[in-house]
C-alpha cells in the first residue's frame, strides 16, 4: 500500500486507502495530507464562528488546549503527530424515503432520518424500488462505522507496521466536514452540510487520523485550490467522486432553497449556521425550555431536522438516480426503521422511560433524553392544531421537568388559540 523499501518510511497512497475503505463498506473515501492548504482559513472561520456565539451551549465545541487554542481548529492541536486523514463517507439515504417537507398525516412527528438506522438480516440485500426484505434490528451508526474504519486501520497496521492512529465517528475533537472537503469528498453547501455530487449530503463521516505521510503524488493531487464560494469551479477542481483528494467545486450556484426553507432562520448567512437557532440543536443539544419564537416554527420536528437537506436539489438528484438505476446495493446496517418514519405523536407521548430506553437503545434519539423528547413532542402537539392532544398536554403542565412543563403550557395555549 505504500513504499516499504529499505531505509524508507512507510507512506499512504490514495488509491489503496480508498480501495480498502470501500471494501470495508463505505461508499466513498478520500485522503488528505496534514496540514492541508486551506487549514489556516478553516481554523480562522471556526474561531470566528465560536466567538460569535453560534455554537450555542455546545461546550464541547469550545474546548481548548493548554495553550488556549480551540481543539477543533485543526486536527494537529489535539493530535500533534497527525500527518494525514482518511475520511470515509457512508450514505444513509434510501430511494423510497418520504421527505420532511411533504404533507404527512396530521398528528405525525418527524425524526431526522439519520436516526432511523437499523440492520437487516441477512447481512446484505439487493432491492429495486421497494423496501429491503428481512428482519430488522436497531443499529447504532457510531458502532457500525467505527467497526468499519477500525478494520481499515487494522489493515494499514498489518501492511505498514507501527504508527500513531486514531479513528472517530462523530465523537472526536475534529471538524470532520472540513477534513472531508479537503479530502475531495464534496463541497460545503450553503446549508453547511458536506454535499457529494453523486451521493448528496445524507451521509455519515468516519475519520482515521494517522502519523503516516501521504505519497508525494497523492500530496500533489490533494492540494486544494482556493474556494471563493463562487458558482464556478476553482482551478484544479473536479467532480465529487471522480478523483477524491482534489478540491471539489462549489456547485450550489445561485440556489438559496435551504436558506429560504429554514423555519428558524438558522441559515442567516450562506455557508454559515447559527446553531443556537437550528432545530436540530434545539431538539437534541439544548436542555431546558425552548423559546417561544423557535417553538412556533419547529412544526412537527421532534428529533433533529432534515428540511435544509430535503429541499436541496443535489439530494433529490441522488435519490432519483437511485430510483432509476435498477437494483441497487443497500447498506444493510443503515436501512430505515419503519416505525420511526413519520411516527405518531400519540405513540411517542405514550412511551414511559423504560419503553423509551427499550425502543431507542443504541439509537441517536437517546441523546435528546426521555424528557427532552417529551418536551419536543409537546411542542409538536401544540403546532398540530389538533385538540385531541389537549388532555395529554394538560397532564404535562404539572410535570416536574421545567422544559416539559413550559412546553406543555405553551402548546395548550396555542391549541386553544387556534
Annotate each PLM feature.
Residues 2-224, 243-249:
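Auxiliary alpha/beta "docking" domains used to position bulky ligands
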Residues 36, 257-280, 287, 300-330, ...:
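Iron-sulfur cluster-binding cysteine motifs and their immediate structural context
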Residues 197-220, 224-228, 246, 274-294, ...:
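Short, charged low-complexity linear segments at domain edges
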Residues 336-371, 378:
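Alpha-helical adaptor scaffolds
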Residues 355-359, 386-397, 417-418:
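Amphipathic alpha-helical scaffolding segments comprising HEAT/armadillo-like alpha-solenoid repeats
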Residues 366-368, 397-404:
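Short coil turns that connect the paired helices of HEAT/ARM alpha-solenoid repeats
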Residues 374-386, 406-417:
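Structural detector for internal amphipathic alpha-helices that build alpha-solenoid repeat scaffolds
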Amino acid at each position: 500500500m505504500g513504499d516499504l523499501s529499505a531505509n524508507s518510511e512507510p507512506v499512504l497512497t490514495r488509491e489503496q486507502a480508498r480501495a480498502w475503505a470501500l471494501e470495508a463498506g463505505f461508499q466513498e473515501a478520500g485522503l488528505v495530507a496534514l496540514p492541508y492548504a486551506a487549514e489556516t482559513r478553516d481554523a480562522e472561520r471556526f474561531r470566528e464562528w465560536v466567538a460569535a456565539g453560534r455554537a450555542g451551549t455546545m461546550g464541547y465545541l469550545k474546548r481548548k488546549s493548554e495553550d488556549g487554542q480551540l481543539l477543533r481548529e485543526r486536527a494537529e492541536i489535539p493530535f500533534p503527530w497527525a500527518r494525514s486523514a482518511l475520511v470515509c463517507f457512508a450514505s444513509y439515504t434510501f430511494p423510497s424515503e418520504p421527505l420532511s417537507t411533504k404533507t404527512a398525516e396530521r398528528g405525525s412527528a418527524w425524526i431526522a432520518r439519520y436516526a432511523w438506522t437499523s440492520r437487516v438480516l441477512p447481512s446484505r440485500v439487493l432491492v429495486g424500488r421497494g423496501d429491503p426484505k428481512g428482519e430488522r434490528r436497531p443499529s447504532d451508526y457510531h458502532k457500525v462505522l467505527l467497526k468499519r474504519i477500525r478494520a481499515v486501520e487494522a489493515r494499514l497496521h498489518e501492511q505498514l507496521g507501527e504508527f500513531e492512529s486514531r479513528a472517530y465517528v462523530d465523537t472526536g475533537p475534529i471538524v470532520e466536514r472540513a477534513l472531508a472537503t479537503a479530502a475531495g469528498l464534496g463541497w460545503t453547501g450553503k446549508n453547511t452540510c458536506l454535499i457529494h455530487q453523486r451521493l448528496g449530503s445524507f451521509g455519515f463521516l468516519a475519520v482515521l487520523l494517522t502519523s503516516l505521510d501521504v505519497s508525494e503524488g497523492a500530496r500533489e493531487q490533494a492540494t486544494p485550490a482556493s474556494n471563493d464560494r463562487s458558482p464556478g469551479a476553482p482551478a484544479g477542481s473536479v467532480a465529487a467522486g471522480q478523483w477524491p483528494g482534489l478540491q471539489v467545486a462549489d456547485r450550489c450556484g445561485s440556489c438559496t432553497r435551504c436558506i429560504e426553507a429554514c423555519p428558524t432562520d438558522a441559515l442567516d448567512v450562506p455557508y454559515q449556521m447559527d446553531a443556537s437557532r437550528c432545530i436540530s440543536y434545539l431538539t437534541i443539544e439544548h436542555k431546558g425550555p425552548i423559546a417561544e419564537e423557535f417553538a412556533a416554527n419547529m412544526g412537527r420536528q421532534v428529533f433533529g431536522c432534515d428540511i435544509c437537506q430535503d429541499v436541496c436539489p443535489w439530494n433529490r438528484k441522488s435519490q432519483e438516480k437511485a430510483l432509476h438505476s435498477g437494483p441497487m446495493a443497500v447498506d444493510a446496517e443503515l436501512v430505515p426503521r419503519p416505525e420511526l418514519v413519520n411516527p405518531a405523536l400519540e405513540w411517542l407521548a405514550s412511551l414511559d422511560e423504560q419503553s423509551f430506553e427499550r425502543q431507542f437503545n443504541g439509537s441517536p434519539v437517546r441523546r435528546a433524553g426521555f424528557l427532552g423528547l417529551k418536551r419536543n413532542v409537546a411542542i409538536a402537539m401544540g403546532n398540530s392544531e389538533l385538540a385531541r392532544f389537549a388532555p395529554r398536554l394538560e397532564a404535562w403542565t404539572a410535570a416536574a421537568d421545567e422544559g416539559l412543563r413550559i412546553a406543555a403550557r405553551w402548546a395548550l395555549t396555542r391549541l386553544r388559540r387556534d
